[in-house]
Amino acid sequence: MASVAKTGAEALRNAPFRVGKKQIFLPNHVITFVRPLPKQPPNLATFIVPLEFNKLDLRDYLYHVYNVEVTGVRSFVNQRMHEQRHGDVGNWRRPKSQKMMIAELAKPFVWPKPPAEDAREAFDYAMWKKQKTAQEQDTKFQGIRAQGEVVPPSQFEVTKDRKAIKARQSKFLSGEETWAPGKVNAFLNSKIVPEEEGWSEVEENLPLDESAESAAEESSSKGSETRQ
């Protein structure tokens, strides 16, 4: 512990600029390092900082925590657009403003390139893309409904799951397959859920656990006794 304090004191003495003397323990500030724009030079770093932050706070923070020397800091506040409190309903309000700072680094920093599509598959990137597409589509239709227009079902994208459910429904109606009450859902099989999505095969018509059935019977019998 003494060596750490000694190192910190030595760093303060060797600082190329005058640093603040006020010590802050366990701060709750959130500082976000933002990926730069395509043509932004590598000696400029962009951060999202709290509104009460000033330029000296960011300069001292980068120097004390990451040992990064900063030669200058520029700050600006982004005013948010008006929006409704609950999506497309509720009172109109202006969200809290966002403060950003651009620090001029003494040593340039180059961001690493984003990983390729193949490398992202290990982090469930395919599912993330599906969720993002569904969220964008839902936001689009919410905006249309907010203007008083009706969105017909024909404009919704037909997913693989809906196509598979429709195919299984036609088999049930034609009599090719029969529904089995008390069994595992027949939709959870390798035909409906593709293997490339990471799902394992589930056996059809697999009986439920006997312990679960007995527990359900006991709860139903207790409920009938209570009513009597």
From Swiss-Prot:
Gene3D superfamilies: 3.30.70.330. Residues 195-216 have a biased composition (Acidic residues). GO terms for molecular function: structural constituent of ribosome. GO terms for biological process: mitochondrial translation. InterPro entries: Nucleotide-bd_a/b_plait_sf (IPR012677), Ribosomal_uL23-like (IPR013025), Ribosomal_uL23/eL15/eS24_sf (IPR012678). GO terms for cellular component: mitochondrial large ribosomal subunit. It is found in: Mitochondrion. It comes from the Eukaryota. The keyword Chaperone does not apply. Keywords: Mitochondrion, Ribonucleoprotein, Ribosomal protein. Residues 194-228 are annotated as: Disordered. Component of the mitochondrial ribosome (mitoribosome), a dedicated translation machinery responsible for the synthesis of mitochondrial genome-encoded proteins, including at least some of the essential transmembrane subunits of the mitochondrial respiratory chain. The mitoribosomes are attached to the mitochondrial inner membrane and translation products are cotranslationally integrated into the membrane. Component of the mitochondrial large ribosomal subunit (mt-LSU). Mature N.crassa 74S mitochondrial ribosomes consist of a small (37S) and a large (54S) subunit. The 37S small subunit contains a 16S ribosomal RNA (16S mt-rRNA) and 32 different proteins. The 54S large subunit contains a 23S rRNA (23S mt-rRNA) and 42 different proteins. uL23m forms the wall of the exit tunnel. Belongs to the universal ribosomal protein uL23 family. This is Large ribosomal subunit protein uL23m. The gene is mrp20.
